[in-house]
């Protein structure tokens, strides 16, 4: 497997010239202005207090996500920010409100004019290197609406708690992705019959040399799926920096751990990938989950997390809200699954005792979430316990409780929101 070079020349697509340039991307003048007041009271040899350290970090952190708006911080380094649920009331999540997920702290600036995608491996006949312009012009462009969802979305809702980024319900976003089919690009290399998996690497990296490079692989059949893309546009615009500029992998129906950002390297392999992020991380027990999606990476006890599970979310109500009982209340939400499509979404206003059908909105494709709507006509005052449950076309319905697993993946239990009518 090709290693990332320790140093890059200035004409390369990205540089690790300094921590501020590589990750924080802050404007030097703004940083000095923001941090000068904090540092002014310190003597030359005085150790900064925790409050001072936090203030300096705040000066660094407020700049990097200036292209984003209103996100909920989960961690600074690596940058992990989730989307407030209120932004899920549109078909496509606006780019500036789209969640941010990284495993590494160094997110380099990339010059798209110099960016190159290298394709190699022991299971191809002809290695290939592509510029962004070649990628955009030499292959047919396609669009697909698809939900990008972090494997650990809703992790904070597991009880007992599990370790990891404590995501709420906002580590996801629905977008219209434009790019080229991965299978078309790889066809130009002459894939050998020995090909088993294809691995992907991006430009981000860890602070320490010992940090495992974030690399993921896919089984060949998923790679050759016509819906798997290398995307360079998101909702009609070039990919935002924090969502993978200039090109990223799109794997509809699978969790976002495979959607490699800042894509730089693809390797077609005749053997299973054996790196940390495949053999140790992002794995779930076989008990309680469907197996068979990634056979070359399965063991007797566990397997990689792959396909999304059927799920739904109420998007315009919050727990404890108060409404007048004199008028109807519109309840909105979204539902999704691995790509079979949503057959129905039901809603209960009495804590699950009775259920009624909601009205499904326009279908933007089987990998997009499906919006739904329900008009609640109050019959009494007091508490209403609102629940929603989705059923896929394949007949799978959301469970009452999630399947427990060590890493807090696939939380798809029924959501309950209590509102008061007066």
Give residue ranges: language-model regions.
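N-terminal secretory signal peptides
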Residues: 1-27, 52
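Enrichment for repetitive, rod-forming helical segments
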Residues: 11, 35-36, 41, 108, ...
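N-terminal export signals
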Residues: 23-24, 30-52
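Short, cationic motifs built from Arg/Lys/His that form the positively charged side of catalytic pockets
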Residues: 28-29, 248
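Structured, non-membrane catalytic/scaffold regions adjacent to prosthetic-group chemistry
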Residues: 53-422
């Amino acid at each position: 497997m090709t290693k990332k070079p320790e140093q890059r020349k200035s004409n390369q697509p990205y540089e690790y010239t300094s921590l501020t340039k590589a990750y924080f991307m802050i404007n030097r003048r703004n940083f000095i202005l923001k941090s000068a007041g904090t540092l002014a009271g310190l003597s030359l040899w005085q150790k900064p207090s925790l409050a001072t350290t936090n203030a300096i970090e705040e000066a660094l952190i407020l700049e990097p996500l200036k292209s984003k708006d209103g996100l909920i911080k989960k961690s600074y380094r690596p940058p992990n920010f989730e989307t407030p649920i209120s932004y899920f009331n549109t078909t496509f999540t606006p780019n500036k409100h789209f969640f941010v997920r990284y495993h590494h702290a160094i997110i380099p600036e990339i010059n798209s004019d110099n960016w190159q995608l290298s394709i190699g491996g022991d299971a191809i006949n002809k290695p290939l290197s592509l510029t962004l312009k070649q990628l955009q012009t030499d292959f047919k462009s396609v669009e697909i609406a698809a939900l990008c969802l972090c494997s650990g979305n809703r992790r904070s809702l597991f009880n007992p708690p599990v370790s990891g980024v404590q995501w709420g319900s906002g580590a996801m976003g629905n977008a219209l992705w434009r790019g080229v089919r991965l299978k078309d690009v790889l066809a130009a290399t002459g894939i050998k019959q020995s090909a088993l998996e294809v691995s992907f690497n991006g430009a981000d990296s860890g602070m320490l040399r010992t940090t495992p490079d974030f690399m993921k692989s896919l089984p060949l059949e998923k790679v050759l799926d016509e819906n798997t893309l290398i995307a360079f546009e998101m909702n009609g615009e070039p990919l935002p920096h924090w969502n993978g500029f200039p090109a990223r992998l799109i794997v509809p129906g699978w969790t976002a751990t495979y959607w490699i950002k800042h894509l730089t390297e693809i390797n077609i392999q005749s053997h299973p990938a054996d790196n940390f992020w495949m053999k140790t991380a992002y794995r779930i027990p076989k008990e309680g989950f469907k197996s068979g999606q990634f056979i070359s990476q399965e063991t007797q006890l566990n397997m990689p997390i792959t396909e999304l599970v059927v799920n739904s979310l109420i998007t315009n109500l919050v727990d404890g809200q108060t409404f007048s009982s004199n008028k109807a209340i519109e309840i909105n939400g979204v539902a999704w699954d691995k790509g079979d499509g949503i057959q129905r979404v039901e809603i209960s206003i009495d804590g699950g005792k009775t259920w009624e059908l909601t009205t499904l909105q326009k279908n933007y494709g089987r990998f997009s979430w499906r919006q739904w709507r329900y008009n609640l006509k109050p019959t009494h005052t007091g508490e209403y316990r609102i629940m929603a449950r989705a059923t896929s076309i394949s007949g799978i319905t959301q469970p009452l409780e999630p399947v427990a697993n060590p890493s807090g993946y696939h939380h798809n239990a029924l959501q309950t929101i209590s509102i008061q009518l007066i």
